[in-house]
Protein backbone atom coordinates (compact mmCIF):
# COMPACT_ATOMS: atom_id res chain seq x y z
CA UNK A 1 0.00 0.00 0.00
CA UNK A 2 1.29 3.48 -0.76
CA UNK A 3 2.53 5.25 2.31
CA UNK A 4 3.27 2.02 4.14
CA UNK A 5 6.92 1.32 4.98
CA UNK A 6 8.26 -2.18 4.79
CA UNK A 7 8.39 -4.11 8.05
CA UNK A 8 11.20 -6.31 6.73
CA UNK A 9 14.94 -5.75 6.91
CA UNK A 10 15.29 -7.42 3.52
CA UNK A 11 15.82 -3.90 2.23
CA UNK A 12 17.64 -0.91 3.67
CA UNK A 13 14.61 0.74 5.15
CA UNK A 14 11.36 2.38 4.13
CA UNK A 15 11.03 1.10 0.55
CA UNK A 16 10.84 -2.64 -0.14
CA UNK A 17 12.81 -3.32 -3.30
CA UNK A 18 12.14 -7.04 -2.97
CA UNK A 19 8.45 -6.65 -3.81
CA UNK A 20 8.63 -4.01 -6.57
CA UNK A 21 10.04 -4.03 -10.08
CA UNK A 22 11.47 -0.52 -10.10
CA UNK A 23 13.28 -0.57 -13.45
CA UNK A 24 16.54 0.78 -12.05
CA UNK A 25 18.78 -0.62 -14.75
CA UNK A 26 16.70 1.13 -17.42
CA UNK A 27 15.85 4.46 -15.83
CA UNK A 28 18.49 5.02 -13.14
CA UNK A 29 21.79 4.85 -14.99
CA UNK A 30 24.67 6.80 -13.42
CA UNK A 31 25.22 10.17 -15.05
CA UNK A 32 28.92 10.77 -15.79
CA UNK A 33 28.79 14.45 -14.79
CA UNK A 34 27.26 13.70 -11.41
CA UNK A 35 29.75 10.84 -11.04
CA UNK A 36 32.67 13.20 -11.63
CA UNK A 37 31.52 15.50 -8.82
CA UNK A 38 31.08 12.58 -6.42
CA UNK A 39 34.46 11.06 -7.24
CA UNK A 40 36.23 14.40 -6.86
CA UNK A 41 34.72 14.72 -3.39
CA UNK A 42 36.31 11.43 -2.36
CA UNK A 43 39.69 13.13 -2.62
CA UNK A 44 42.76 10.90 -2.64
CA UNK A 45 41.01 7.98 -0.92
CA UNK A 46 42.14 4.59 -2.13
CA UNK A 47 39.65 2.50 -0.14
CA UNK A 48 35.97 3.47 -0.26
CA UNK A 49 32.95 2.09 1.59
CA UNK A 50 29.63 2.37 -0.27
CA UNK A 51 26.72 1.93 2.16
CA UNK A 52 23.23 1.33 0.80
CA UNK A 53 25.02 0.64 -2.45
CA UNK A 54 22.06 -0.64 -4.43
CA UNK A 55 23.12 -1.70 -7.92
CA UNK A 56 26.45 0.08 -7.57
CA UNK A 57 25.64 3.42 -9.16
CA UNK A 58 28.52 5.88 -8.98
CA UNK A 59 31.04 3.45 -7.50
CA UNK A 60 34.51 4.42 -8.75
CA UNK A 61 36.35 1.69 -10.63
CA UNK A 62 39.84 3.05 -10.00
CA UNK A 63 39.74 2.51 -6.22
CA UNK A 64 39.17 -0.38 -3.85
CA UNK A 65 35.44 -0.34 -3.04
CA UNK A 66 33.50 -2.39 -0.51
CA UNK A 67 29.75 -2.18 -1.06
CA UNK A 68 27.14 -2.89 1.61
CA UNK A 69 23.57 -3.59 0.47
CA UNK A 70 20.83 -5.54 2.30
CA UNK A 71 18.46 -6.02 -0.65
CA UNK A 72 18.97 -9.23 -2.63
CA UNK A 73 17.05 -7.70 -5.52
CA UNK A 74 19.38 -4.71 -5.69
CA UNK A 75 22.51 -6.84 -5.21
CA UNK A 76 21.45 -8.97 -8.18
CA UNK A 77 21.42 -5.86 -10.37
CA UNK A 78 25.09 -5.05 -9.78
CA UNK A 79 27.01 -5.20 -13.08
CA UNK A 80 29.64 -7.89 -13.46
CA UNK A 81 32.57 -5.51 -13.43
CA UNK A 82 31.76 -4.57 -9.82
CA UNK A 83 32.53 -6.73 -6.80
CA UNK A 84 29.62 -8.47 -5.05
CA UNK A 85 28.14 -6.50 -2.17
CA UNK A 86 28.36 -7.42 1.49
CA UNK A 87 24.96 -8.10 3.08
CA UNK A 88 24.54 -5.60 5.88
CA UNK A 89 22.90 -2.48 7.28
CA UNK A 90 24.20 0.98 7.99
CA UNK A 91 23.43 0.81 11.70
CA UNK A 92 25.68 -2.23 12.26
CA UNK A 93 28.64 -2.37 9.90
CA UNK A 94 30.94 -5.41 10.19
CA UNK A 95 34.19 -3.43 9.94
CA UNK A 96 36.89 -2.18 12.30
CA UNK A 97 37.19 1.43 13.38
CA UNK A 98 38.75 3.57 10.64
CA UNK A 99 38.81 0.70 8.16
CA UNK A 100 38.23 2.89 5.07
CA UNK A 101 39.77 6.05 3.66
CA UNK A 102 36.36 7.39 2.60
CA UNK A 103 32.69 6.47 2.38
CA UNK A 104 29.94 7.26 -0.09
CA UNK A 105 26.19 7.28 0.59
CA UNK A 106 24.26 7.75 -2.64
CA UNK A 107 20.58 8.65 -2.25
CA UNK A 108 20.22 6.14 0.56
CA UNK A 109 20.18 7.82 3.98
CA UNK A 110 16.51 8.84 3.66
CA UNK A 111 15.59 5.14 3.56
CA UNK A 112 17.37 4.15 6.76
CA UNK A 113 15.24 3.35 9.83
CA UNK A 114 17.71 5.09 12.18
CA UNK A 115 19.53 7.73 10.18
CA UNK A 116 21.53 9.14 13.09
CA UNK A 117 22.79 5.73 14.22
CA UNK A 118 23.65 4.73 10.66
CA UNK A 119 25.66 7.87 10.01
CA UNK A 120 27.53 7.58 13.30
CA UNK A 121 28.40 4.01 12.37
CA UNK A 122 29.67 5.07 8.95
CA UNK A 123 31.76 7.75 10.67
CA UNK A 124 33.20 5.10 13.01
CA UNK A 125 34.58 2.97 10.19
CA UNK A 126 35.74 5.88 7.99
CA UNK A 127 38.90 7.85 8.68
CA UNK A 128 38.46 10.39 5.89
CA UNK A 129 35.64 12.09 3.98
CA UNK A 130 32.07 10.83 3.92
CA UNK A 131 30.26 11.90 0.76
CA UNK A 132 26.45 11.97 0.90
CA UNK A 133 24.29 12.52 -2.19
CA UNK A 134 20.92 13.76 -0.98
CA UNK A 135 18.21 16.37 -1.55
CA UNK A 136 17.58 19.59 0.32
CA UNK A 137 13.84 19.95 0.09
CA UNK A 138 13.98 23.54 1.27
CA UNK A 139 14.76 24.15 -2.42
CA UNK A 140 11.84 22.08 -3.71
CA UNK A 141 10.01 25.13 -5.02
CA UNK A 142 12.69 25.62 -7.68
CA UNK A 143 11.21 22.66 -9.57
CA UNK A 144 7.84 22.77 -11.32
CA UNK A 145 6.90 19.38 -9.86
CA UNK A 146 6.21 21.08 -6.52
CA UNK A 147 3.24 22.81 -8.13
CA UNK A 148 1.93 19.79 -9.99
CA UNK A 149 2.34 17.28 -7.15
CA UNK A 150 2.62 18.88 -3.70
CA UNK A 151 2.07 15.39 -2.30
CA UNK A 152 5.35 14.26 -3.86
CA UNK A 153 7.24 17.07 -2.15
CA UNK A 154 5.47 16.50 1.17
CA UNK A 155 6.39 12.82 1.20
CA UNK A 156 10.01 13.28 0.18
CA UNK A 157 10.59 16.20 2.52
CA UNK A 158 9.48 13.98 5.39
CA UNK A 159 11.91 11.22 4.38
CA UNK A 160 15.10 13.16 3.64
CA UNK A 161 17.05 14.41 6.67
CA UNK A 162 17.77 18.10 6.98
CA UNK A 163 21.22 19.10 5.79
CA UNK A 164 22.14 20.49 9.22
CA UNK A 165 21.16 17.19 10.85
CA UNK A 166 23.33 15.26 8.39
CA UNK A 167 26.30 17.44 9.23
CA UNK A 168 25.74 17.06 12.96
CA UNK A 169 25.45 13.27 12.82
CA UNK A 170 28.62 13.09 10.74
CA UNK A 171 30.63 15.03 13.31
CA UNK A 172 29.72 18.63 12.63
CA UNK A 173 32.37 19.46 10.00
CA UNK A 174 30.77 19.41 6.56
CA UNK A 175 30.52 21.45 3.40
CA UNK A 176 27.58 21.42 1.02
CA UNK A 177 27.71 21.59 -2.79
CA UNK A 178 24.86 22.04 -5.24
CA UNK A 179 24.76 19.28 -7.85
CA UNK A 180 23.83 20.65 -11.30
CA UNK A 181 21.58 18.27 -13.21
CA UNK A 182 22.23 18.21 -16.98
CA UNK A 183 19.38 18.39 -19.46
CA UNK A 184 20.09 14.88 -20.76
CA UNK A 185 20.71 13.39 -17.30
CA UNK A 186 20.69 9.59 -17.41
CA UNK A 187 19.91 9.11 -13.71
CA UNK A 188 16.14 9.31 -13.64
CA UNK A 189 15.42 11.12 -10.40
CA UNK A 190 12.46 13.46 -10.76
CA UNK A 191 14.61 16.57 -11.32
CA UNK A 192 16.35 14.81 -14.22
CA UNK A 193 13.20 15.50 -16.24
CA UNK A 194 13.07 19.23 -15.54
CA UNK A 195 13.16 19.90 -19.30
CA UNK A 196 11.52 16.65 -20.44
CA UNK A 197 8.18 16.76 -18.61
CA UNK A 198 6.48 14.19 -20.84
CA UNK A 199 8.71 11.52 -19.33
CA UNK A 200 7.09 12.02 -15.92
CA UNK A 201 3.81 10.74 -17.38
CA UNK A 202 5.43 7.33 -17.94
CA UNK A 203 4.57 4.94 -15.07
CA UNK A 204 7.87 3.12 -15.59
CA UNK A 205 9.82 6.34 -15.06
CA UNK A 206 7.92 7.06 -11.85
CA UNK A 207 8.38 3.47 -10.65
CA UNK A 208 12.14 4.05 -10.58
CA UNK A 209 11.59 6.93 -8.12
CA UNK A 210 10.78 5.38 -4.74
CA UNK A 211 8.79 8.37 -3.51
CA UNK A 212 5.82 7.50 -5.73
CA UNK A 213 5.38 4.29 -3.74
CA UNK A 214 4.30 6.50 -0.82
CA UNK A 215 1.95 8.80 -2.75
CA UNK A 216 -1.71 7.83 -2.81
CA UNK A 217 -3.05 6.64 -6.20
CA UNK A 218 -5.61 9.46 -6.31
CA UNK A 219 -2.85 12.04 -5.93
CA UNK A 220 -0.83 10.39 -8.69
CA UNK A 221 -3.88 10.51 -10.96
CA UNK A 222 -4.34 14.21 -10.24
CA UNK A 223 -0.70 14.81 -11.09
CA UNK A 224 -0.75 12.96 -14.41
CA UNK A 225 -4.09 14.46 -15.44
CA UNK A 226 -3.03 18.03 -14.72
CA UNK A 227 0.44 17.71 -16.25
CA UNK A 228 -0.94 15.91 -19.29
CA UNK A 229 -3.59 18.57 -19.81
CA UNK A 230 -1.10 21.43 -19.47
CA UNK A 231 1.28 19.80 -21.92
CA UNK A 232 -1.53 19.27 -24.42
CA UNK A 233 -2.80 22.85 -24.09
CA UNK A 234 0.64 24.44 -24.10
CA UNK A 235 0.18 25.87 -20.59
CA UNK A 236 3.28 24.09 -19.30
CA UNK A 237 5.41 25.43 -22.13
CA UNK A 238 4.18 28.97 -21.69
CA UNK A 239 5.46 28.94 -18.12
CA UNK A 240 8.35 26.50 -18.20
CA UNK A 241 9.21 25.99 -21.86
CA UNK A 242 12.62 27.63 -21.42
CA UNK A 243 13.66 24.56 -19.43
CA UNK A 244 13.52 22.40 -22.56
CA UNK A 245 16.79 23.96 -23.74
CA UNK A 246 18.36 24.99 -20.43
CA UNK A 247 21.70 23.11 -20.25
CA UNK A 248 21.49 22.34 -16.54
CA UNK A 249 19.19 22.73 -13.57
CA UNK A 250 20.19 23.62 -10.03
CA UNK A 251 17.43 22.30 -7.85
CA UNK A 252 17.47 20.40 -4.57
CA UNK A 253 20.21 17.81 -5.22
CA UNK A 254 23.17 18.26 -2.88
CA UNK A 255 26.49 16.71 -1.96
CA UNK A 256 27.33 16.85 1.73
CA UNK A 257 31.04 16.19 2.31
CA UNK A 258 32.03 15.57 5.91
CA UNK A 259 35.73 15.45 6.78
CA UNK A 260 37.24 14.42 10.09
Region annotations inferred by a language model:
Residues 1-46, 57, 72-77, 129-164, 184-191:
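Conserved class I S-adenosyl-L-methionine
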Residues 107-111:
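Short catalytic micro-motifs in class I SAM-dependent methyltransferases
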Residues 176-260:
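Conserved Class I S-adenosyl-L-methionine
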Residues 104:
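A conserved beta-strand element that flanks and buttresses the S-adenosyl-L-methionine
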Residues 116-130:
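A short glycine-rich, Lys/Arg-flanked "PGG" loop and its adjoining helix->strand segment in the class I
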